[in-house]
Amino acid sequence: MKVIVFAYHEIGYIGLSCLIKLGFKVLSVITHIDDHASEKIFFSSVKKKSLKHKIPVFYPKNINNLKWIDYLSKLKPDIIFSFYYRKILSEDILKIPKLGSFNLHGSLLPKYRGCSPLNWVLINGEKTTGVTLHRMTKKIDHGSILSQYSIKIEEKDTSKSLYKKLCYASMYILNKTLPMILKNKINEIDCTDDFSSYFHKRYPKDGLIDWNQSANNIYNLIRALTKPWPGAFSYLFDKKIIIWKSKISFESYKTPGTILNFNPLIISCKKKSLEILSAQYTECNILNKRNIENISRIKGKKLIIKNIKSFKNLKKILILGVNGFIGYHITNLLLKYNNYKIYGIDIKNNLVKSFIGNEKFCFIKGDIKQYYNWVKKKIKKCDIILPLIAIARPMQYIKNPLKVFKIDFEENLKIIRYCVKYKKRIIFPSTSEVYGMCKDDYFDEENSNLVTGAIKNQRWIYSSSKQLLDRIIWAYGVKNNLNFTIFRPFNWIGPGLDDFKIAEKQNARVTTQIIFNLINGLPVTIVNNGNQKRCFTDIDDGIEALFEIIKNKNNKCNKKIINIGNPHNEYTIMQLTKIIINIIYSNNRNYNFPKFSGFNMLSGTNYYGEGYQDIDRRKPNIDIAKKLLNWTPKTKIRITLRKIINFFINNNTS
């Protein structure tokens, strides 16, 4: 059987070796250059193995161009195999072989699709992982499964020890499955999306330790990134300290990052503490506690291990409404990077409590009307202004329209004018509601009409306030050269959207309200038969897009309006409700929820009050987001709903 092999790293070497041993005819090998300058080479060379067996071997920069597609096509392979090759193969390449293309992935698919599953499973504290041989399709790691092998993750496993286990598992699965493929006996099962997850590529900078995490979380990060990977790190006296090995200690809690003891070296975390067993400070290896005292000359001093060198070069971001749904999630992401200093204000702090004490987070609890001098100074000081203060619950549009106008329009207009005055970049959260009753199949930022209802229908106060602010920002951009990006979220949902205190008053947004009623044995209220269609977007997908707007690579987002939504997650409210019911009661044996109490069917007027008008559907065109942000939403509705339900179960039930 004739095959082409894409391979790299130790598992790539194992895959190629197994094919040669079993008698496959390897026509060509595509690999990467063994670059000692850019990474530590601790694995066997696929290139050398190929040359030893006189197999043509190449390492192209762009395997998907026409030259290489033509070369591979002329070889006429029966199968393409990919073993830890680092580039995505185009559909044109995948369809070349007669029997298909197969990939060996380092996780138990559909869990941990994407990059760096070895590191991610350790970071997330998983107990099992494995390897999967699967068919390659246009969608990454979605093809049908030929074979899987499960591996137990021990508490003391590190990236190195787990990688060895993955190598043995790869050898086992290939020796078991390849002979069947050689006989053209390929048995496959579907790779469903149930319990699927996707993780992005990790970079050395992602190893920055956040001491506001628990000791357990930091321990997992350290063992996931230890040698031969670049390591988890922090800063001591403005010099990097890389921590290679640790164990959890039970010292009393102090400010996270405080060195509690030198012999042994113990550093406090948000919960418990870490004893450092091995570390590297500048060019010196720290293998004992006396060594660190001599290196840093800090014996007897109280000091903090810092997350960053200095704040001078950090991009400063002011987030108004930082404790809200979007504010919390974007802050959580930004603080994981070494590039941002966050200034935030909100009337509550329940979500951002865990950030307080972080040197990169400055928080004021209060109303912006009472702290306007502070807000004004921070607008003048910061690089980016993100005004997230708004009332965004439909019940309030009807009951308190003037309050909605006061907060959503008047307060935000002041912020916009300060941004004009001080020449600051503003990233403004518009809303999908500005499209109103638009009849387009897909709502387009540049061409769709914005259609609202009669004046007596007060539910449009929110949409109209946001639309007018969009127009004002645009005008300031034209006349005063205001640097802005407007983003329009389409039904972002996830943990923390609303809390149960709001749901107790039957005043929460639809997802939270449905879950609350079901968990508490209350009838689920369905408005206008639940035929309204919405496109639901996972908060992590939305935040990923917002993060790209903040980074603004090559200034692509300047003076742009960008829809951020998931057009593939379109469901009626009734369909959404039935999915939630299915998820909740499939877990009922674990939580003993009350029996389903049925539906309470109401008209919009009876539920919200006079002045309500429904919107049948809103579906985004996300071509601009794809182009400018290189972003597409990935998360399916069931995965998002499971996260929300688990969040509420863990935080609101005994």
Swiss-Prot record:
Disulphide connectivity of cysteines: none
Residues the UniProt record annotates as site (Raises pKa of active site His): D141
GO biological process, any: lipopolysaccharide biosynthetic process
Residues of the active site: H105 (proton donor), E433 (proton acceptor), R618 (proton donor)
Annotated pathway: Nucleotide-sugar biosynthesis; UDP-4-deoxy-4-formamido-beta-L-arabinose biosynthesis; UDP-4-deoxy-4-formamido-beta-L-arabinose from UDP-alpha-D-glucuronate: step 1/3; Nucleotide-sugar biosynthesis; UDP-4-deoxy-4-formamido-beta-L-arabinose biosynthesis; UDP-4-deoxy-4-formamido-beta-L-arabinose from UDP-alpha-D-glucuronate: step 3/3; Bacterial outer membrane biogenesis; lipopolysaccharide biosynthesis
Alphabetized GO MF terms: carboxy-lyase activity; UDP-4-amino-4-deoxy-L-arabinose formyltransferase activity; UDP-glucuronate dehydrogenase activity
The reaction(s) this protein catalyses: UDP-alpha-D-glucuronate + NAD(+) = UDP-beta-L-threo-pentopyranos-4-ulose + CO2 + NADH; UDP-4-amino-4-deoxy-beta-L-arabinose + (6R)-10-formyltetrahydrofolate = UDP-4-deoxy-4-formamido-beta-L-arabinose + (6S)-5,6,7,8-tetrahydrofolate + H(+)
Assembly behavior: Homohexamer, formed by a dimer of trimers.
Name by which UniProt lists this protein: Bifunctional polymyxin resistance protein ArnA
Taxonomic lineage: Bacteria, Pseudomonadati, Pseudomonadota, Gammaproteobacteria, Enterobacterales
Name of the encoding gene: arnA
